[in-house]
């Protein structure tokens, strides 16, 4: 089988490494891939948003199955375009990817179908949003409607901060068209949990829960990032919580999408907050999370490609999806200065014995050498029998990898360890 994977980050590297385990796979193409993925797949210089280019390549190269990993191509209809050419895909069609593509859509969906989420208001113009903020309780949360590279959510501690956030989105257009309409919602408190799930529109199979670390610096200080590390499973996500989420959130969401004529097939990501009033949805993503994938897939004992194809063919209930009961920790090594300005082009040294634990994101090949090319450079994942062991193992591997201006948090998993002690 010839497999095409759209995307070029650490998440895609994790998917590709897992798919390589399937004996039927003879060739994997990554569009565009990256310098590290090149060790595991043939990277082709076609951008993830170039839908026509992706389809042309897939047809000309006799691709048997495509996996569209990032949000942009999913929202732009990459799956629709590939399926029209008879190429089966893993990932939702554009009509279903809107669950991430529009915050206004997803909030209204939850309201209509009684899925627990934060109270909210939608605004289509700056004036009415600013007027609303005069009396709105703070802290409050301002969200751009469309995709914004994970940076379109601002938690405002004061009214002035909230107003500035509205102005930056609606007047200054920092997120372009994504800020044409915005959601202002209540600020929720409680532990956050990420749950990725496989769904074929009928069955929902949650993967192992995980805990993300969004802030750039230790102690959850600094700016929000795409994620500086993850651990799995998330200790706050107990069996009782999982049962409640399945009944009140996971199954109702899939049923709601079906009722709207937007059947979702692929990986549906639930960003949850465990509030004093029960679990609530903070966000939906229409794809595997990054860096959650880098801890969840190493714990998957079933064959990933077999599960994905069952999703595509709407027979997920027929396959076994089994996860290990071990713990995993992923530490992201970034370029110093990320998520703001940073230098790139530094050579990366990864010892051979560590490479199998590394998922490369922001790196390119230059004269045959791997060099830094992005903010988040790579993720290092370790799996062990306990969380403390997984954390320790992950950091011991990090210390063996070198590049100038490397920077990483030194407290990934610390919050999870505290939670384990509390429980």
Located regions from the model:
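Peripheral (often C-terminal) accessory segments that flank ATP-dependent C-N-forming ligase machineries
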Residues: 310-423
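Solvent-exposed alpha-helices and their adjacent loops that cap or buttress functional pockets
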Residues: 21, 36-38, 90, 112-114, ...
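Internal nucleotide-binding/catalytic subdomain
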Residues: 152, 156-293
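Active-site "cap" helix and flanking loop/linker of ATP-utilizing ligase/carboxylase catalytic domains
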Residues: 246-268, 285-355
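Short acidic-hydrophobic, aromatic-tinged amphipathic segments that line or gate anion-handling sites
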Residues: 43-49, 121-125, 156
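A conserved helix-loop-beta module that forms one wall/lid of the active-site cleft
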Residues: 90-151
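ATP-binding N-terminal substructure of ATP-dependent carboxylate-amine bond-forming enzymes
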Residues: 1-94
């Amino acid at each position: 089988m010839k497999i095409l994977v759209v995307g070029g980050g650490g998440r895609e590297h994790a998917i590709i490494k897992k798919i390589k385990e399937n004996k039927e796979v003879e060739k994997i193409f990554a569009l565009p891939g990256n310098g590290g993925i090149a060790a595991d797949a043939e990277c082709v210089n076609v951008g993830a948003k170039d839908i026509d280019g992706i389809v042309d390549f897939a047809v000309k190269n006799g691709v048997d199955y495509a996996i569209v990993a990032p949000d942009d191509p999913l929202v732009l209809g990459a799956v629709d375009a590939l399926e029209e050419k008879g190429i089966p895909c893993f990932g939702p069609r554009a009509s279903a990817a809107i669950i991430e593509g529009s915050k206004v859509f997803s909030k209204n969906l939850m309201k209509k179908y009684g899925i627990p989420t934060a109270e909210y208001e939608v605004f289509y113009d700056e004036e009415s949003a600013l007027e609303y903020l005069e009396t709105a309780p703070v802290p409050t949360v301002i969200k751009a409607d469309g995709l914004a590279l994970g940076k379109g959510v601002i938690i405002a501690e004061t009214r002035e901060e909230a107003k500035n956030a509205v102005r930056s989105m609606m007047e200054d257009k920092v997120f372009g068209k994504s800020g044409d309409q915005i959601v202002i919602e209540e600020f929720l408190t409680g532990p956050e949990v990420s749950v990725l799930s496989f769904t074929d529109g009928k069955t929902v199979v949650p993967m192992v829960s995980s805990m993300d670390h969004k802030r750039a610096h230790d102690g959850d200080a600094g700016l929000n990032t795409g994620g500086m590390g993850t651990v799995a499973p998330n200790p706050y996500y107990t069996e009782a919580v999982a049962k409640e989420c399945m009944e009140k959130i996971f199954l109702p969401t899939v049923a709601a999408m079906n009722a709207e004529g937007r059947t979702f097939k692929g990986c549906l990501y639930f960003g949850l907050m465990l509030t004093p009033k029960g679990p609530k949805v903070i966000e939906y993503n229409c794809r595997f999370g990054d860096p959650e994938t880098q801890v969840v897939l190493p714990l998957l004992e079933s064959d990933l490609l077999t599960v994905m194809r069952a999703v595509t063919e709407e027979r997920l209930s027929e396959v076994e999806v089994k996860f290990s009961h071990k713990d995993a920790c992923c530490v992201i090594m970034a370029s110093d200065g990320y998520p703001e300005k940073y230098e790139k082009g530094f050579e990366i040294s990864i010892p051979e014995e560590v490479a199998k634990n590394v998922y490369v994101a922001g790196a390119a090949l230059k004269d045959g050498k791997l060099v830094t090319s992005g903010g988040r450079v790579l993720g290092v994942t370790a799996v062990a029998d306990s969380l403390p062991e997984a954390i320790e193992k992950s950091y011991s591997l990090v210390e063996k990898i070198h590049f100038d201006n490397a920077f990483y948090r030194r407290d990934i998993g610390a919050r999870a360890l505290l939670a384990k002690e509390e429980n």
